[in-house]
């Protein structure tokens, strides 16, 4: 037998009055005896705190404060502790003989709230020899000890081998450990469970009948049937899920068209835009390529035009240059003509001026003679005037000498003055400022020598002058002629120059005679040279146009070659026209074929899409229509096989469901009629009695009872006889066994157990041999095991059935798809690929276009070559007649030679014309130049100069002679003052002086008159000279101008200049005509270039815009493609058949779909916003986002338990396959899941009956309990009338209320609540929902009413109420109820705890003095019978006979309180035996 766990001791550390006290607890009753305030309640509070460390529940009050809500005077738990670390520990030993110490560490928290900190812990594996006080205290000396903190306690225990210390952060974990180790009777999972446990302990502690427990006895005594509730909840959850699934199916069925519509329109909306963008991208690429080709072609054309323009511009520049040259030549020729004409006029003027000059020359010579005579007369007058002047001077001198003679002093003064005057005059004339009277003699000799030299030179010059006077006139005439011809020169060079000029004049006359023949020869050669230059220009132009230089010898052969080429090119051009027509015809045929293929391509693509879908669905490749028809036959055969297998699996699944339903019957009855018969007979099914048989014992009992394992056990068979008469609604074999259902055993049979079998001796002559069944069904455990295996098998079968059903419907749909394909697409599906042929034709078309382009280029080149050949022939026709001129290389040299000779002859003619007369005059007198006399004028000047020098020297010598002669007079300085007076001589001299002065005046007047006449002669001479010089200068200017003109003014010069001018005018006109043609062609070319440039610029702009658009679209398209590929929707969007629609058709298709989508997503805010964002034409990726959002939305709407795919399109296809099958299966499942109302009533009744039997068993244990007048205590359990009526209606009249239970809108709980309201309309349900009420009605405890009754004296059985009982009777009754609750908890928790553990039982009773001795004895008997421990507190007058008693006395020692404890074990006549460890331990700590 399993021993019950016990509490060994209670240890208090640092409590109020208890420093370190351990109370050993008795196995039955431990009594705490002592006066008021001795510490009994503190000890019990420490026990309760260690048992339930929940501060929200702990509330300690004295019994004298009954009804009070506030704490006691010692402040509850806070007041029972001392400062510092406190402990309360329980030392227990469980059924496994494991010592477990559980407890709490308590510590007061400072503050006004007076809180307490609690930390629960547990110690396992502690040796028996170690006392709890040794763990938590440390002895300091003999009189002092210290309480260890929790961390030190932990370290101390971890150091001990085999000891485990656990600290708990939650009370739930703490109680869980206590429950698992058998310390408490019930698992306290929640705060509600802890509250019930605390209320139980509190009721036990304070005694009496607790209203909190009696009001909720059902919660304390009746276990919660969680299995039944969970079964109902699972059933309802399954039904709810089933119904939700059915509703989802119905919603899906209703949404299927919406799904189809949404997917179809979304696909049309996005795919049309997707394909439109793809088409536009291809079109843009084609346009970009076309623009690039056109751009390349235009650039080539522009380059050709530019080359042409450059050529024409170069030719135009040449013509412009030539025109400038021609204009210059023409202007030069015109100017030359004008110059010739001017020269002729100038020559006439020159001849006229030369005649005038000859006349002026004669007049000038005559006037020179008149002037010479006037000059001679002028010289005579000057001599006479000079003589008169000298006479006046002489007279003045004589007048001065005469005065000197008048008086010596005067004379000396005069002499002195004259000497000074002579000295000053000598200084001035001799230019000797330092001259003195003393040095005058020396200077006189010098100046006399100079006078002599000057006189000799003057005489020599006078002789020379007389000799040169005769030759001067002829030499001057010849010299002037030489100067006129040659220009200024030295006189000594005149003879040589004159001879050279005469010889040159002869040569120049000979050259001048050759001018006319040379001019005619030059004109002829210049004409030939111009023709040669024109031929060279034509040849150079021809070579430039041909791009090659040709020799003159090659031109005739080239002319023939070009004519042959012209003929050949003419044939090629005609042949090219025919070839071009053939190519264009083939191109048109290709275009027509491509159009027909493009019309057929969408039909073929649709057939291929359908064929690909069929191939994907069936995993086969079809190459011909025969493959399709053969596979269709295979599909039909497979469909038949799948239907047969599905039906077989469905039959097996139904059989399993039936077996599960049969085994799931309550009580283990496989026949519902047995339950009704058992209730009718007042018996119990045998299977229900053995419902708790373990799985190991089930085969034995199943074989033991054999066919009678479904028997009904009745108390009395005789009472059943009357019910058997007329009984028809029963199994074929009905077994009835007489026995007490509460104490039934298997002793009714004589059994011999064999190996896996039994032999049952039914009678002496009848045995039954039964083998143990392989699958036993006897007992709940066996049935549950079987049901579990059946459920597993059913899951496999259901999955297989679902798979087969899906395969069947999939096969059927595949058959329908094949049928549609055969009817619609079989005719075109296996034809050749039109797109491949289109690609081939397009490549051929590109080749044809390239060939046409090349052909056009070749033809253009041939035309250009043809035109070039024609131009070359034309040019050669102009060049060939002039080949002889081109071959004449010396023509230019001869022209230059003749031109040089002509220039020389013309120069000679101009020389003869200009200087011929002067040479003729010079020739007879040239000999006078041989002896060139000195220059007459120079000689005259030298003579006059020598005269002046001789005169000056004579005057200087005279002045110095006078100074020398008057050297003595310088000493008469004193006599200068003595001069005065006049004399008569002086007067006479004065008169003569006046006459001389008059004569001088007349001479001067005559000189002045003759000078005026000379001036007139000179003026006439000057006028003639001026006229002659002017004429001479004009003549020189005219000759110089004629020389500057540089033309020969002969008689034929004007005619030649006019002919030359006319020729150049003709060339200039031709050049201007060609230039105008070139300018027009150049203007046209420039216009063409401008057009090409504008076109090129437009093409470049269009190309770059298109390229930028392509690049931009490419980036967006890449994002679109990336998004498409990432989301796997390319197959849905890339619909190739749409590629053949126009952009307008696709845009119209997209717009129509957009309108439909706006209506479809009007109620979906997310899709509506995404759709609105997708309407931006610049953001095509947003349409993909919308398509993905639609797919995601549809994926979220897809029930994955119905349709196993993420693709909404496939989901719709699978949906149609699954919906009908699931609807049928779920409807059947709902019927099977839905438990019948009768079954519910039977389950509740059976549960109520079982609990009533259990309460009856509990009552048997309280029959002998008596307290005072109370003789017995019992629990009365009754079914409430309203609930009993509900059970009757559920079992008997459920057909009348099927509207509730068959409603798909109500769960079973709600239907049950509605039925309860319908049966009890007078009851107010308040604010509770039907679901809540229904769940309460599924709990059997709500069907029962429980009350405690006591058998008191003569009153009999009365309801136990505190007012009807004495205090002791109430305490005893309450304790009886608590014992019943604890026992009920143990029974309830037995299946949750290990089978080898029996939990501790312990209750409290404070203030037990209110019980009499008989009641105390009753408690002791109750504790002994129930193996329960009891801690009671009583005053000192209580003396229990059994158990352990502790005497507690509170003492005060040196202001310190401590409790003195003495422990006694039992009462007897002998002296009480002192328990070990009863001595008072010191209560003080250091």
Curated annotation (Swiss-Prot):
The keyword Coiled coil applies. InterPro entries: MukB, MukB/SMC, MukB_hinge, MukB_hinge_sf, MukB_N_dom, P-loop_NTPase. Its main location: cytoplasm. It holds the Pfam family MukB_hinge. The lineage of its organism: Bacteria, Pseudomonadati, Pseudomonadota, Gammaproteobacteria, Enterobacterales. Keywords: ATP-binding, Cell cycle, Cell division, Chromosome partition, Coiled coil, Cytoplasm, DNA condensation, DNA-binding, Nucleotide-binding. Residues 666-783 are annotated as: Flexible hinge. Belongs to the SMC family. MukB subfamily. Residues 326-418, 444-480, 509-603, 835-923, 977-1115, 1209-1266 form a coiled coil. This is Chromosome partition protein MukB. It is found in: Cytoplasm, Nucleoid. Plays a central role in chromosome condensation, segregation and cell cycle progression. Functions as a homodimer, which is essential for chromosome partition. Involved in negative DNA supercoiling in vivo, and by this means organize and compact chromosomes. May achieve or facilitate chromosome segregation by condensation DNA from both sides of a centrally located replisome during cell division. The hinge domain, which separates the large intramolecular coiled coil regions, allows the homodimerization, forming a V-shaped homodimer. GO terms for cellular component: cytoplasm; nucleoid. GO terms for biological process: cell division; chromosome condensation; chromosome segregation; DNA replication. One of its GO terms (molecular function) is ATP binding. ATP binds at residues 34-41. NCBIfam families: PRK04863.1. Homodimerization via its hinge domain. Binds to DNA via its C-terminal region. Interacts, and probably forms a ternary complex, with MukE and MukF via its C-terminal region. The complex formation is stimulated by calcium or magnesium. Interacts with tubulin-related protein FtsZ.
């Amino acid at each position: 037998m399993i021993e019950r766990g016990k509490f060994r001791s209670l240890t208090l550390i640092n409590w109020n009055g208890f420093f370190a006290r351990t109370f050993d607890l008795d196995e039955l009753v431990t009594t705490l005896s002592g006066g008021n305030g001795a510490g009994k309640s503190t000890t019990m509070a420490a026990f309760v705190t260690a048992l339930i460390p929940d501060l929200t529940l702990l509330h300690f009050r004295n019994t004298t404060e009954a009804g009070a809500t506030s704490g006691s005077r010692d402040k509850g738990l806070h007041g029972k502790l001392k400062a510092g670390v406190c402990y309360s520990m329980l030392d227990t030993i469980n059924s496994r003989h494991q010592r477990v110490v559980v407890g709490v560490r308590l510590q007061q928290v400072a503050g006004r709230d007076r809180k307490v900190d609690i930390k629960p812990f547990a110690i396992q594996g502690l040796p028996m020899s170690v006392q709890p006080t040794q763990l938590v205290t440390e002895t300091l000396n003999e009189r002092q000890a210290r309480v260890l903190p929790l961390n030190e306690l932990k370290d101390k225990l971890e150091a001990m081998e085999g000891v485990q210390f656990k600290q708990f952060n939650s009370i739930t974990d703490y109680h869980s450990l206590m429950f698992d180790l058998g310390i408490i009777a019930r698992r306290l999972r929640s705060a509600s469970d802890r509250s019930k446990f605390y209320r139980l302990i509190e009721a036990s502690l304070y005694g009496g009948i607790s209203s909190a427990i009696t009001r909720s006895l059902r919660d304390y005594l009746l276990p919660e049937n969680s299995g039944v509730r969970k079964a109902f909840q699972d059933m309802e959850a399954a039904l709810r899920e089933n119904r939700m699934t059915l509703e989802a199916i119905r919603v899906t069925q209703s949404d299927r068209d919406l799904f189809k519509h949404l997917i179809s329109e979304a696909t049309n909306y996005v795919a049309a835009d997707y394909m439109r963008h793809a088409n536009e991208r291809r079109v843009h690429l084609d346009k970009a390529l076309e623009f690039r080709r056109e751009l390349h072609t235009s650039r080539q054309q522009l380059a050709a035009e530019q080359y042409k323009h450059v050529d024409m511009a170069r030719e135009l520049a040449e013509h412009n240059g030539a025109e400038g040259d021609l204009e210059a030549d023409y202007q030069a020729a015109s100017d030359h003509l004008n110059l010739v004409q001017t020269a002729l006029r100038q020559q006439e003027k020159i001849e006229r001026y030369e005649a005038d000059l000859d006349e002026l020359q004669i007049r000038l010579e005559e006037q020179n003679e008149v002037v010479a005579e006037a000059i001679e007369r002028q010289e005579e007058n000057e001599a006479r005037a000079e003589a008169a002047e000298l006479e006046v001077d002489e007279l003045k001198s004589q007048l001065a000498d005469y005065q000197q003679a008048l008086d010596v002093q005067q004379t000396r003064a005069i002499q002195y003055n004259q000497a000074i005057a002579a000295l000053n005059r000598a200084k001035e004339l001799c230019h000797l400022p330092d001259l003195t009277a003393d040095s005058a003699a020396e200077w006189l000799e010098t100046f006399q020598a100079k006078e002599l030299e000057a006189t000799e030179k003057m005489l020599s010059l006078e002789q020379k002058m007389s000799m040169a006077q005769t030759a001067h006139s002829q030499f001057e005439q010849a010299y002037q002629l030489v100067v006129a011809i040659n220009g200024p020169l030295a006189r000594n060079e005149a003879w040589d120059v004159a001879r050279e000029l005469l010889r040159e004049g002869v040569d120049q006359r000979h050259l001048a005679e050759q001018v006319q023949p040379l001019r005619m020869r030059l004109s002829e050669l210049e004409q030939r040279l111009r023709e040669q230059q024109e031929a060279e220009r034509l040849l150079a132009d021809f070579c430039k146009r041909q791009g090659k230089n040709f020799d003159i010898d090659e031109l005739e052969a080239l002319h023939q070659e070009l004519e042959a080429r012209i003929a050949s090119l003419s044939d090629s051009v005609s042949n090219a026209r025919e070839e071009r027509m053939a190519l264009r015809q083939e191109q048109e045929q290709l275009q027509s074929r491509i159009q027909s293929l493009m019309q057929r391509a969408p039909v073929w693509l649709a057939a291929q899409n359908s064929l690909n879908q069929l191939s994907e669905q069936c995993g086969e490749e079809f190459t011909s229509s025969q493959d399709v028809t053969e596979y269709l036959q295979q599909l039909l055969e497979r469909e038949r096989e799948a239907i047969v297998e599905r039906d077989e699996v469905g039959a097996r699944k139904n059989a399993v469901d039936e077996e599960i339903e049969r085994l799931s019957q309550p009580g283990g009855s496989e026949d519902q009629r047995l339950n009704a018969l058992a209730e009718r007979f007042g018996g119990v099914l045998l299977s229900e009695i053995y419902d708790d048989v373990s799985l190991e014992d089930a085969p034995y009992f199943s074989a033991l009872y054999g066919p009678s394992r479904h028997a009904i056990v009745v108390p009395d068979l005789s009472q059943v006889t009357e019910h058997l008469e007329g009984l028809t609604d029963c199994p074929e074999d009905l077994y009835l066994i007489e026995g007490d259902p509460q104490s039934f055993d298997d002793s009714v049979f004589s059994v011999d157990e064999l190996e896996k079998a039994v032999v049952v001796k039914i009678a002496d002559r009848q045995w039954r041999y039964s083998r143990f069944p392989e699958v036993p069904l006897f007992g709940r455990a066996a049935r549950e095991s079987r049901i579990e295996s059946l459920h597993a098998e059913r899951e496999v079968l259901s999955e297989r059935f679902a798979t087969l059903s899906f395969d069947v419907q999939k096969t059927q749909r595949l058959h329908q798809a094949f049928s549609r394909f055969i009817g619609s697409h079989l005719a075109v599906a296996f034809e050749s690929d039109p797109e491949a042929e289109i690609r081939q034709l397009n490549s051929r078309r590109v080749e044809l276009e390239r060939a046409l382009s090349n052909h056009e280029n070749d033809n253009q080149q041939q035309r250009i070559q043809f035109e070039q050949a024609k131009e070359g022939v034309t040019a050669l026709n102009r060049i060939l007649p002039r080949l002889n001129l081109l071959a004449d290389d010396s023509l230019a040299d001869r022209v230059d030679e003749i031109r040089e000779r002509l220039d020389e002859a013309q120069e000679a003619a101009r020389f003869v014309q200009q200087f011929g007369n002067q040479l003729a005059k010079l020739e007879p007198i040239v000999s006078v130049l041989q002896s060139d006399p000195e220059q007459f004028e120079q000689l005259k000047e030298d003579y006059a100069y020598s005269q002046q020098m001789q005169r000056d020297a004579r005057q200087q010598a005279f002045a110095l002679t006078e100074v020398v002669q008057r050297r003595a007079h310088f000493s008469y300085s004193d006599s200068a003052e003595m001069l005065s007076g006049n004399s008569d001589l002086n007067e006479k001299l004065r008169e003569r002086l006046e006459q001389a002065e008059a004569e001088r005046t007349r001479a001067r007047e005559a000189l002045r008159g003759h000078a005026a006449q000379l001036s007139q002669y000179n003026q006439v001479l000057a006028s003639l000279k001026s006229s002659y010089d002017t004429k001479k200068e004009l003549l020189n200017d005219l000759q110089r101008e004629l020389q500057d003109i540089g033309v020969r003014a002969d008689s034929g010069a004007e005619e030649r200049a006019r002919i030359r001018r006319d020729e150049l005018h003709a060339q200039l006109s031709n050049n201007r005509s060609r230039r105008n043609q070139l300018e027009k062609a150049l203007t046209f070319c420039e216009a063409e270039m401008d057009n090409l440039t504008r076109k090129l610029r437009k093409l470049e702009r269009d190309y770059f815009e298109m390229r930028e658009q392509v690049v931009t679209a490419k980036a967006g398209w890449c994002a679109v493609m990336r998004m498409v590929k990432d989301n796997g929707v390319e197959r849905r969007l890339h619909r190739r058949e749409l590629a053949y629609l126009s952009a307008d058709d696709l845009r119209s298709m997209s717009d129509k779909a957009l309108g439909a989508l706006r209506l479809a997503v009007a109620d979906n805010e997310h899709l509506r916003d995404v759709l609105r964002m997708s309407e931006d034409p610049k953001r095509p990726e947003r349409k993909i986002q919308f398509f993905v959002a639609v797919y995601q939305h549809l994926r979220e709407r897809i029930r994955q338990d119905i349709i196993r795919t993420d693709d909404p399109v496939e989901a719709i296809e699978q949906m149609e396959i699954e919906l009908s099958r699931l609807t049928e299966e779920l409807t059947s499942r709902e019927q099977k899941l839905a438990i019948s109302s009768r079954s519910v009533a039977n389950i509740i009744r059976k549960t109520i009956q079982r609990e009533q039997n259990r309460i009856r068993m509990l009552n048997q244990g309280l029959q002998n309990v008596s307290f005072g007048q109370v003789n017995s205590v019992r629990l009365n359990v009754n079914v409430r009338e309203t609930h009993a009526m509900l059970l009757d209606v559920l079992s008997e009249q459920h057909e009348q209320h099927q509207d509730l239970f068959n409603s798909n809108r109500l769960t079973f709980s709600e239907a049950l609540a509605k039925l309860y309201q319908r049966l009890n309309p007078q009851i107010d349900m308040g604010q509770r929902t039907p679901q809540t009420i229904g769940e309460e009605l599924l709990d059997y405890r709500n069907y029962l009413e429980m009350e405690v009754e006591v058998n008191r004296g003569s009153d009999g059985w009365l309801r136990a109420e505190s007012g009807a009982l004495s205090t002791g009777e109430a305490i005893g009754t309450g304790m009886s109820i608590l014992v019943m609750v604890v026992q009920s908890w143990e029974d309830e928790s037995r299946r949750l705890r290990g089978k080898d553990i029996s939990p501790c039982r312990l209750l409290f009773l404070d203030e037990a003095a209110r019980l009499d001795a008989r009641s105390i004895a009753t408690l002791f008997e109750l504790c002994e019978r129930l193996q329960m421990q009891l801690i009671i507190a009583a005053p000192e007058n209580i003396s229990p006979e059994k158990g352990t008693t502790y005497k507690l006395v509170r003492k005060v020692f040196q202001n310190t309180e401590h409790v003195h404890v003495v422990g006694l074990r039992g009462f007897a006549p002998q002296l009480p035996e002192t328990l070990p460890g009863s001595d008072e331990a010191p209560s003080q700590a250091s």
